[in-house]
Amino acid sequence: RNISKGVTGFSEMCRTMGAVPGAKTIKIAIEDPTEKDMELMHITPDKKILVLERIRYADEKPVLLEINRFPESFSFLFGENLNDTSLYDVLQNHNIIFDHSDKTLDIVFASAQEAKILGISKGYPLLRIESTIYNTDCSLVQRCKQLCIGDKFKFTI
């Protein structure tokens, strides 16, 4: 089941692999935008963004740290239970439909904080996937950075 053309979420990928997806919210906050947020979301420094960080699990094992950045209009997410659920399903229930995304992939090494969150050693290689996700009007809906333990999860892009 594709919830939108060209964009596949973590939960859907897990199910396709025969794994049970899970999620634990570790942060949800309204913050000042970064320069990149302002550039991609076409917002000014006086605007705010919503930041959502979650640990993603496959069969109850941590495999990915997910950092999502949304326009402040997504503050309705504060009222949602975002643990053990598909974020894309939650957004779809709010009539937010994804159309396409741009992705950049590279290898990075886990910081002490990332290593602690994911249960790995500092310096462990991670696959970093940075995505900008757009709706059918080609408006940016979400920026997402995923740090994936490459030997524990396989991405289909």
Model-derived regions: residue spans:
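Short, solvent-exposed beta-strand/turn "edge" segments of beta-rich domains on protein surfaces
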Residues: 41-46, 57, 62, 119-121
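Hydrophobic residues on conserved beta-strands that form the core of alpha/beta folds
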Residues: 25, 51-52, 65, 128-129, ...
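C-terminal regulatory/effector modules of DNA-binding transcriptional regulators
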Residues: 61, 73, 80-81, 88, ...
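Generic secondary-structure microfeatures
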Residues: 56, 69-72
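Short, well-ordered beta-strand segments enriched in hydrophobic/aromatic residues
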Residues: 53, 66-68, 138
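HTH-adjacent hinge/linker in prokaryotic transcriptional regulators
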Residues: 1-51, 67, 75-102, 106-109, ...
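Hydrophobic beta-strand positions
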Residues: 55-56, 133
